Design a protein with these regions (language model features):
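Carbohydrate-associated surface elements
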Residues: 204, 226
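Nucleotide-activated donor-binding/catalytic signature segment of Leloir-type glycosyltransferases, i.e.
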Residues: 291-313
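Glycosyltransferase donor-sugar binding loop
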Residues: 276-295
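Conserved donor-binding/catalytic core segment of Leloir-type glycosyltransferases
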Residues: 237-254, 260-264, 278
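Acidic donor-binding loop of glycosyltransferase active sites
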Residues: 323-337, 350
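Conserved acidic donor-binding segment of nucleotide-sugar-dependent glycosyltransferases
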Residues: 366-378, 387-392
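A conserved catalytic-core segment of Leloir-type glycosyltransferases
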Residues: 38-126
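A short, well-ordered alpha-helix in the C-terminal region of glycosyltransferases
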Residues: 380, 387, 394-409, 415-421, ...
Length: 430
């Protein structure tokens, strides 16, 4: 089977779990003798293996933004489009968060969801023509429901099944103004009827999106994210220094402020003087001021030497990060549909301390490799850390259980086999 996986790129300026999810699935599907084509949208992809084989970036972020905002750009010569879609321009755009956050992009989100009725209809036709004439897939897999505007024309032109993953669309949509938020959910529900199946990354998020988009149960599948534990090395957690790790985009929404405040509370107790904090995951320009505030708080507490900020987050630096932390916490303010960093940590033998939000309890519960706390406050997080971070026996127990839990419930090869079965089911129905 030949699968075209359409994936929005983040540009590589921060740890993008959704991008890594798609990249890992592509490799696992190829191991199952499936032919997979990764088709990037908006920005270049963040992944460990840069193997796009010169597939062009469709819907270049700079190009479509200018055409959306300034009508004059809709009539520019082709060489201008090529320049705006060059890798150097797109990588520069990725450093500026306007392309990776919803505020200010509401109208473009609506236009993208409208597909052939939106302002990006030219880009849509270019993508469809390339899929039809060059890629020639048997099935198209959309990375998230914000891409549902592509489905109608793909099916009209190619008469093949289209499936759509569900992960964190609410994070993008719910920060919009009331008017745009309601409009986007309505269009997503309507356009969602045009795909053959939805695939949620967690039970939690399946229930959430079933309610929001009124998805029929027979069209909704659950396929947890997976990792290959062979890709990670396990350093015995009992031999590590007591270092708490954070790996995600370093921003307010991902709980960086909660993390720092909890660490300051923890360090008020002299019993935890050996504990350090290690932070990585990248950022965009939008995050700079907030990060500066956190560093100022740390400096005011005299803890600059206890907190290590690591700029590089792609492999091998990411593995080095996992080699040196004994515990992982990413206290996302409103939770997440999944959170791939949890599996990367567990596969490296690192226990989790996560808030009881989103799918975090689902991952912790199935893996048995961590603890959760509630509410998501600095005080509760510091208390949860205290119950584990200096307890070598407890850390070791959670480390062993977590690694086994990943192998049992979140193995990328098993999950990929399930994904192929979903493709086969929709292909028969289509």
């Amino acid at each position: 089977m030949k699968i075209a996986h359409i994936i929005p790129g983040s540009g590589g300026s921060f740890y993008c779990g959704n991008c890594l999810r798609d990249s890992k699935y592509m490799k696992a599907l190829q191991d199952l003798d499936q032919e997979v084509i990764k088709v990037p949208l908006y920005l270049p992809l963040f992944e460990d293996a840069h193997d796009l084989n010169e597939v062009p970036v469709f819907y270049g972020a700079v190009d479509i933004y200018l055409k959306q905002r300034f009508p004059v750009f809709r009539h520019m010569p082709a060489f201008v489009d090529r320049m705006l879609n060059s890798k150097s321009v797109l990588n520069l755009a990725a450093q500026n968060a306007g392309s990776t956050r919803a505020k200010g992009l509401e109208e473009m989100t609506v236009s993208m969801l409208l597909g052939e009725e939106g302002l990006q209809k030219g880009e849509l036709e270019r993508l469809v023509e390339w899929l039809r004439d060059e890629a020639k897939p048997d099935v198209v897999h959309l990375s998230n429901a914000l891409l549902l505007g592509l489905a109608r024309r793909i099916k009209q032109e190619m008469n093949i099944p289209v499936v759509c993953s569900l992960q964190d669309e609410d994070v993008w949509v719910d920060v919009m103004s009331d008017k745009h938020r309601e409009e986007v959910w309505q269009i997503m529900e309507a356009r969602g009827r045009e795909v053959d199946a939805f695939i949620s990354v967690s039970d939690f998020y399946a229930k959430e999106m079933k309610k929001r988009m009124h998805i029929r149960p027979d069209r909704l599948f659950i396929n947890h994210i997976g990792v290959d534990t062979a890709d990670y090395q396990v350093k015995p957690v009992q031999d590590k220094e007591p270092v708490i790790g954070f790996i995600s985009r370093m921003c307010e929404e991902n709980g960086l402020g909660v993390l720092v405040d909890a660490f300051l509370l923890l360090k008020e107790d002299e019993a935890y003087s050996p504990v350090k904090l290690k932070i990585t995951g990248g950022k965009t320009n939008d995050d700079t001021a907030f990060i500066k505030q956190q560093k100022k708080k740390i400096a005011s507490a005299g803890l600059e030497e206890q907190v290590l900020w690591v700029e590089e987050f792609e492999n091998p630096s990411r593995q080095n990060f996992f080699d040196t932390v004994a515990l992982l916490t990413v206290p996302v303010l409103n939770g997440e549909a999944f959170g791939l960093y949890q599996l990367e940590a567990l596969a490296s033998g690192i226990p989790l301390v996560q808030p009881e939000l989103g799918a975090f309890p689902e991952v912790v519960g199935l893996s048995e490799g961590g603890v959760t706390y509630h509410p998501n406050s600095p005080k509760k997080l510091a208390k949860a850390w205290k119950s584990i971070i200096l307890d070598k026996e407890k850390l070791t127990e959670l480390s062993v259980k977590g690694l086994e839990g990943v192998k049992t419930h979140f193995d990328i090869h098993k999950q990929s086999e399930k994904l192929v079965e979903i493709y086969k089911k929709v292909a028969v129905k289509a």
